[in-house]
């Protein structure tokens, strides 16, 4: 069997299994999460190259489902967050981002798993964090907001989720400014109630 054939079969299985055992449809959610700052872009974190700093975040989050596919385990949500950072600097952050939620994993009968991706949002902080300043001390209060999240729940209790989130602020590779700073990245753990 060729590699392409195996890939097509895997994708078909990922789509078909969740359709056979579709869960409840939730339109709203509220939750909270906490995390610690790390000093690389999200790609660096996934490669094990992150170092953690003494900057922390506590946040409230809410989301609303805007669209749900009738044939795929896919939906679009609008996610908002309000957070407080402390440690190296104390500041408040507010952000909003459209998020794709993929719920089609073959093991969902054992552990319901959802992947949430929000690559293009808006984040604003009450001040520029010293961790976000470039070589010449410049930074931006308003940056892009990106999140990558894995959410887990019991198949019989999908309204209660725990999640792991990569919370990322950035200038989109200097598209928004050319100060040479990465922005901020937090590895966070949280809880969400869906209704």
Set out the residue ranges of the language-model regions.
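Transmembrane beta-strand segments that form the barrel wall of outer-membrane beta-barrel proteins
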Residues: 32-36, 42-48, 75-86, 164-168
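Outer-membrane beta-barrel transmembrane domain signature
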Residues: 66-68, 81-187, 191-195
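Generic alpha-helical scaffold signal
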Residues: 52-56, 70-72, 90-94
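Short glycine/proline- and aromatic-enriched beta-strand/turn motifs that initiate or cap beta-hairpins
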Residues: 19-65, 192-193
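Cleavable N-terminal export/targeting peptides
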Residues: 1-26
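Short coil-to-beta-strand
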Residues: 28-32, 71-75, 115
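A glycine-rich, hydrophobic loop/mini-helix early in the fold
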Residues: 59-81
């Amino acid at each position: 069997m060729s590699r392409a054939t195996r890939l097509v079969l895997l994708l078909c299985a990922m789509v078909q299994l969740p359709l056979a055992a579709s869960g409840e449809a939730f339109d709203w959610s509220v939750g909270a999460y906490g995390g610690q700052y790390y000093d690389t872009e999200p790609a660096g974190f996934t490669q094990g190259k992150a170092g953690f700093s003494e900057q922390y975040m506590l946040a409230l989050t809410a989301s609303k489902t805007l669209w749900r596919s009738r044939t795929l385990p896919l939906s679009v949500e609008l996610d908002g967050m309000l957070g407080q950072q402390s440690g190296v600097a104390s500041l408040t952050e507010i952000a909003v981002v459209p998020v794709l939620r993929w719920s089609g994993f073959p093991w969902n009968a054992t552990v319901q798993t959802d992947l949430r991706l929000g690559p293009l949002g808006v984040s604003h902080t009450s001040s520029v964090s010293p961790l976000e300043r470039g070589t010449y001390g410049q930074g931006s209060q308003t940056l892009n907001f990106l999140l990558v999240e894995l959410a887990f729940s019991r198949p019989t209790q999908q309204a209660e989720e725990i999640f792991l989130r990569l919370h990322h602020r950035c200038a989109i590779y200097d598209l928004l400014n050319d100060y040479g700073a990465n922005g901020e990245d937090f590895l966070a753990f949280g809880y969400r109630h869906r209704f």
